Amino acid sequence: NVGNSSAAQTWNDYTYDLKDSELYKHLTDKSLVINSDDKVAAIANCYECYGLIYNKTILEGYCGMDGAVVSSVDEINNFDTLKKVADDINSRIDDINKELGTDLTEAFASAGLDDGSSWRFAGHLANMPLYYEFKDDGCDLTAGEESIKGTYLDNFKNVWDMYVSDSAADPKTLNSGALNAESEFGMGEAVFYQNGDWEFSPLTNEENGYVVTADDLSMMPIYFGVDDENEGLCVGTENYWAVNAKASQEDIDATLEFLNWVITSDEGRDAITNQMGLTAPYDTFTGDYETKNAFAQAANKLMTDGKTSVAWSFNATPNVDDWRADVVSALTAYTAGEGEWDAVKTAFVDGWANQWKIAHEDDAQ
């Protein structure tokens, strides 16, 4: 197993090029590899994803109402449309509840900035501007670079402002710790909820008392206003298969044959999907071996449709806890009307350079 780009560089002399393997041919999203020195050094064996969880039943019901911004969920494929829909839903809560028999209070579940929730925004939403800037700069998408410009922080602001304005939560109380976005969504009070596929289990666990069911759940990308038409969900992993290039060719061939067996045989696919509960990014996982997780199903469909998964660029964050804490502090003040957006930019950009320097000084020691 190779966990990331740094590990691939460390073991570069020992990783066999997998670009001609059956494993690579079956991979549904070719971004789920680690490249090193013009070779495919490692290939993901499973992944997690996050994006905008949404209540499919309520959203489809809204689309059928008179005056709805869109007539189909499929029309929500960019930030501008998403914002118009969220704005409209949030302004018509009473009408929607009356017509659909729902108990909505908001379009978006609360964007809590307390320690138990702020990682969704200082980590997962912050991933979006990092990803697009790293992509522009041509650097490794998960290893990052020592300085950033904040090229896409206006997009970050647009999405964040939507989260806050189209929620019932008081912007001054987002760091109070009294909010529970999962519960709001689970009880059918919100249409949208930024989080990941790990939420499928708690949302569908009957012991939690939520009203949503598996049939209500789906996920769409965090449309960011940059490359919306090509964007998939945010997909990442630290679990990649690699093959030892120093082994004999006979052993290499046997290993490649075994890995292909794992992703094509009934026994191998059953072990991954049903026994281990993992989501595998291969076109062989269909039928009985397709993931039961509705959010992972959405990720797989977007991959199959040719959308590009957004890498987990937040993995490059230097001194992650300190950097995020400064971003959250500035974001909290801005949202409460007690600070300026420029302070968020400073925490994001200058904070990155400062923490990178500190982190690499520590590495040098």
Model-derived features: positions:
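Extracytoplasmic/periplasmic solute-binding protein
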Residues: 35-45, 50, 80-144, 190
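A local structural motif
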Residues: 66-73, 145-148, 161-176, 189, ...
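Short helix-initiation/N-cap motifs at beta->coil->alpha
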Residues: 77-81, 173-187
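Extracytoplasmic/periplasmic substrate-recognition and gating elements
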Residues: 208-277
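Glycine-centered hinge/linker elements that transmit conformational signals in sensory
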Residues: 83-87, 136-175, 222
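Alpha-to-beta junction loops
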Residues: 1, 104, 187-196
